[in-house]
């Protein structure tokens, strides 16, 4: 089976240099090799609130961006949005990808209430180059406030070792896409 990969690099970096923020539901900004999305895909899960995202700095293959939000009402663990930085690249078959070099720094601040979030790489695959997303692979680097994986059973389906890191693997639906997700930090390093 041929598999093609679209990579969404999820990076949250807070810096002091800022450009104009964008706040509408599907607004995006193109910056170098990246597209930054505000992505309020499930904003109706909150009774009210808003979110704004902005690009702070772009230098070569490095990007810094930030997101600010206020959500009230709704379940704290219900995802409201997924701001992200997506790397723009030519689609490739997974078997032709030898490595995906990456480096990420992120920080967050939270003043009150419940803070539930994850920091992750999010990859989408299809069996054809022109196909829609069939599978989503989320690689969680951090989970806060009880954020948990998408799972049909609530239990890991396997333990996967990549290099010297072991991850619990979860599987579940995200609409019509099947998600495979090793959440949180590695079990061992």
UniProtKB/Swiss-Prot annotation:
Residues carrying sugar: 174
A biological-process GO annotation: polysaccharide catabolic process
GO molecular function: cellulase activity
Location(s), subcellular: Secreted
Keyword Cell membrane attributed: no
Record flagged with keyword Signal: yes
Lineage: superkingdom: Eukaryota
InterPro entries: ConA-like_dom_sf, GH11/12, GH12
Keywords: Glycoprotein, Secreted, Signal, Virulence
Record-linked Pfam families: Glyco_hydro_12 (PF01670)
UniProt xrefs under Gene3D superfamilies: 2.60.120.180
One CC-aspect GO term: extracellular region
Cleaved signal peptide residues: 1-20
Effect of disrupting the coding gene: Leads to strongly decreased virulence.
Chief site of localization: secreted
Comment on protein domains: Conserved residues in regions X1 (position 26), X2 (positions 39 to 44), X3 (positions 77 and 78), and X5 (positions 146 to 150) are all required for full binding activity of XLP1 to host soybean GIP1.
Function according to Swiss-Prot or TrEMBL: Secreted XEG1-like protein that has lost enzyme activity but binds to host soybean apoplastic glucanase inhibitor protein GIP1 more tightly than does XEG1, thus it outcompetes XEG1 for GIP1 binding and frees functional XEG1 to support P.sojae infection. With XEG1, is required to elevate apoplastic sugar during P.sojae infection.
Membership in a protein family: Belongs to the glycosyl hydrolase 12 (cellulase H) family.
Subunit structure as annotated in this protein's UniProt entry: Interacts with host apoplastic glucanase inhibitor GIP1.
Protein's UniProt name: Inactive glycoside hydrolase XLP1
Species, as recorded: Phytophthora sojae (strain P6497)
